[in-house]
């Protein structure tokens, strides 16, 4: 098989979903550049013209008329070179991926074939791979992957798998921006590049940024982009996701409830890098349960970041609401009903007051949207308040475990531009909701979740395939290999649980939480950025009460019968 030699331009586009004119004009500009550089071929990513998630447009004729109008403009621009782009096709009231290839204004592709022959350039064919197509061994001189791959912190990019299977020259053309799925969003990672036959794949375009590059295949490729450290890449994915989603919605201002805790601190750091200081508003909303330590952390961060900052105590609002609550009697005929006030009710009232009342009102005056600061460790078990701290326009950090948030914030503290904005006390103060005396950080009290242990356990519940269930975890506990399986320090389980009874109670409690009301909370929470293959929103789930199996009950009784 001969080496394919041609001058090619690959374009890594920021594709705006549904904005056909904007996408097409960008493509036409790149085609014009390719002609000026005497390129033989210009290639665009999957769904380059329309964007991907356009379900609302499925039955709107004007959308498809607009697409056809600009498609013809692209065809007219294919004189003197070949243009290949990914597009959408409607079949049986569903979208499916397709591509178009035009040379000198003539169609050289067919809807039912993934192969293209370019007259005058190749003595064989080009194999086109669309999203979800498996790479196959063929006699093609060149394979092109038209992609829309998202960044995932737990999996490798598609070009790595492709590169191991494809023996021809190989081009990977990805896009940047976001895919908005409603309950979650994905950040498209870019990293478009090329592999000459028998060489390694070379990323020629960066993560998350739009761009294009021209080169002659079979010759020495341009210098690859420098590799990015894992933590830096994670931070960039968060920043670009926030930036692109705000742009997607036509928004420019954000409010953050800055409690002085680790989660709101990370959100603040991210948005401070996305927005100008005048478009970021931070609000500290203390009650009598908030310590001077966390209030001081919030004030220090706001001062260093130099954005809008205000303190709005909620104690009087809570007191007024509780007085009205206590003085209200509900009647039916001659009966009276007085509703009890539990500690949990008062805790949730504080969270809802902060978000649904104060931040929502301030957002209207500021003309901005509320950032949700929830993390995956809390979301999985419903440790948050519905219509309270789970509300917002986007949960940027929603697919990060608590330990990952600590690790990322520690990394950011080494950055010169953020070093002074991240107080040391964030790492020494116990993570706490500060909603009651039981959350007093000055006494070392805090959340009921032991993150160094539970993060690993919860991750096995939802991210491992197959999932770890209580039966599996209990078997590992009985065999003494739970720590090894969850990659925990030896002795961690015995440190947290003094008896099998304590271990089993904890295991069952969190498993019930995961499968119960927390599912309803997740469905009604802010959309979350997906950074993994098993993020919430991607996982289809419903509320199914946990009924222990016979095997679980038998093993549990065996363990408990041996005594403490």
Give the label of every model feature segment.
Residues 53-59, 149-158, 181-183, 346, ...:
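Glycine/threonine-rich flexible loop motifs
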Residues 29-44, 114-167:
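Active-site beta-loop-alpha substructure in enzyme catalytic cores
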Residues 168, 222-259, 264-564:
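ATP/NTP-dependent adenylation/nucleotidyl-transfer catalytic domains that generate, transfer
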Residues 2-41, 240:
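N-terminal glycine-/serine-/threonine-rich phosphate-binding loop
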Residues 62-132, 160-213, 346:
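Catalytic-core segment of enzymes that process non-peptidic bonds
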Residues 2-4, 179-253, 270, 279:
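Active-site-adjacent "lid"/gating segments
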Residues 56-61, 98, 158-161, 187-191, ...:
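Short secondary-structure boundary/capping segments
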Residues 23, 34-57, 84, 140-149, ...:
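Active-site beta-strand/loop signature of hydrolases that rely on acidic residues for catalysis
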């Amino acid at each position: 098989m001969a080496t394919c030699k041609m001058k090619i331009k690959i374009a890594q586009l920021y594709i705006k979903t549904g904005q056909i004119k904007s996408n097409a004009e960008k493509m036409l500009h790149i085609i014009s550049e390719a002609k000026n550089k005497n390129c033989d071929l210009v290639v665009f990513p999957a769904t380059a013209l329309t964007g991907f998630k356009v379900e609302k447009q499925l039955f709107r004729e004007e959308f498809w008329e607009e697409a056809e109008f600009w498609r013809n403009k692209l065809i007219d621009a294919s004189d003197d070179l070949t243009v290949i782009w990914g597009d959408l096709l409607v079949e049986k009231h569903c979208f499916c991926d397709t591509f178009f290839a035009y040379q000198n204004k003539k169609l050289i592709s067919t809807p039912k074939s993934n192969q293209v022959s370019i007259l005058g350039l190749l003595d064989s064919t080009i194999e086109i791979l669309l999203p979800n197509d498996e790479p196959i061994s063929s006699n093609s001189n060149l394979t092109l992957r038209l992609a829309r791959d998202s960044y995932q912190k737990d999996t490798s990019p598609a070009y790595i798998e492709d590169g191991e299977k494809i023996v021809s020259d190989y081009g990977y053309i990805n896009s940047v921006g976001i895919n908005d799925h409603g309950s979650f969003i994905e950040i498209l990672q870019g990293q478009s590049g090329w592999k000459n036959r028998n060489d390694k794949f070379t990323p020629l375009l960066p993560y998350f940024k739009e761009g294009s590059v021209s080169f002659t295949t079979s010759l020495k490729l341009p210098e690859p982009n420098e590799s990015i450290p894992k933590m830096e890449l994670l931070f960039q994915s968060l920043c670009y996701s926030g930036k692109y989603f705000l742009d997607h919605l036509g928004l420019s201002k954000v409010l953050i409830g800055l409690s002085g805790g680790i989660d709101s601190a990370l959100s603040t750091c991210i948005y401070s890098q996305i927005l100008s200081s005048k478009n970021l508003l931070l609000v500290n909303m203390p009650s009598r349960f908030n310590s001077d330590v966390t209030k001081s952390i919030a004030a220090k961060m706001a001062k260093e970041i130099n954005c809008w900052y205000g303190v709005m105590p909620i104690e009087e609002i809570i007191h007024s609401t509780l007085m009205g609550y206590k003085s209200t009697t509900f009647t039916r005929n001659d009966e009276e009903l007085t509703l009890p006030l539990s500690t949990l009710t008062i805790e949730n009232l504080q969270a809802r007051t902060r978000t649904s009342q104060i931040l929502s009102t301030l957002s209207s005056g500021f003309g901005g949207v509320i950032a949700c600061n929830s993390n995956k460790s809390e979301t999985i078990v419903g440790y948050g308040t519905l219509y309270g701290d789970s509300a917002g326009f986007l949960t940027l950090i929603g697919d990060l475990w608590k330990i990952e948030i600590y690790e990322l914030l520690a990394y950011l503290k080494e950055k010169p531009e953020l070093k002074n904005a991240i107080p040391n006390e964030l790492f020494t103060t116990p993570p706490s909701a500060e909603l009651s005396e039981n959350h007093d950080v000055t006494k070392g009290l805090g959340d009921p979740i032991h993150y160094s242990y539970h993060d690993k356990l919860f991750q096995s519940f939802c991210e491992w395939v197959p999932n770890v269930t209580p039966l599996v975890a209990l078997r590992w506990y009985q065999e003494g290999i739970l720590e090894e399986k969850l990659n925990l320090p030896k002795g961690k389980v015995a440190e947290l649980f003094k008896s099998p009874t304590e271990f089993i109670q904890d295991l069952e409690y969190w498993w019930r939480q995961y499968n119960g009301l927390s599912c309803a909370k997740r469905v009604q929470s802010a959309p979350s950025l997906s950074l993994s293959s098993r993020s919430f929103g991607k996982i289809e789930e419903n509320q199914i009460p946990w009924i222990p199996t016979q095997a679980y009950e038998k093993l549990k009784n065996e363990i408990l019968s041996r005594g403490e």
